[in-house]
């Protein structure tokens, strides 16, 4: 079975490598492509847009689906794109996925009840994105890098990108009941970029007939949004990904070879 692993905003395939390596070792065919504008220059990243990322995810999934059912996995932005692809499949625009693995996938950047926000600016994100489309931010500190390695455009935060994603989220939330593929949700309990509320919301509103929700606890104060590379959770996250892949691959084979009534 093929597995499509979609990385997060501003990041790179590096963040999906622990899962890709574990899935490959378990006998699966893992693909972790770079989204448009990622993995290159800052100019290319800033010139990219959510519509490009969505089109790329759809095209890559369609390409891989030519060889049979695909496990669709995504982290953060990649999880949002995976949900969008799964909804397109539910509408008949794409082949149905074997399963859906959502890693630290935000469905809300902020809420008033329960009260939380990725950043205080996100309460007025459309305005801030117009006034200050790109923020220059400090580098990650050495402790964070050691605990949860990450590669990407860490010195810039493109509010325009986040505003584009936020505009897409209401339609994605409305489409969750369409999804029927088995679902596995993984994130860290202390994630302040993607609060656990998002995981519970996805579990409650997704139409999947089989759902697994895993909130992993870590002691470190660093790297809370990176369950795949965090030194305290990466092995467990990889194990969960492999177990879920085996589960959905087995279900796919059972459906394929089940006797048909005449």
What are these regions (language model features)?
Residues 1-41:
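Short, surface-exposed "cap/lid" segments of acyl-processing enzymes
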Residues 41-65:
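Catalytic nucleophile-loop/oxyanion-hole region of alpha/beta-hydrolase
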Residues 74-78, 82:
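Gly/Ala-rich beta-loop-alpha elbow adjacent to hydrolase catalytic centers
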Residues 101-112:
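Active-site nucleophile loop of the alpha/beta-hydrolase fold
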Residues 158-176, 181:
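Active-site nucleophile elbow and catalytic-triad environment of alpha/beta-hydrolase enzymes
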Residues 179, 185-187, 191:
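Short beta-strand/loop motif that positions the catalytic acidic residue
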Residues 192-198:
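Conserved alpha/beta-hydrolase "acid-adjacent" motif
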Residues 218-236:
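Catalytic histidine-centered segment of alpha/beta-hydrolase-like enzymes
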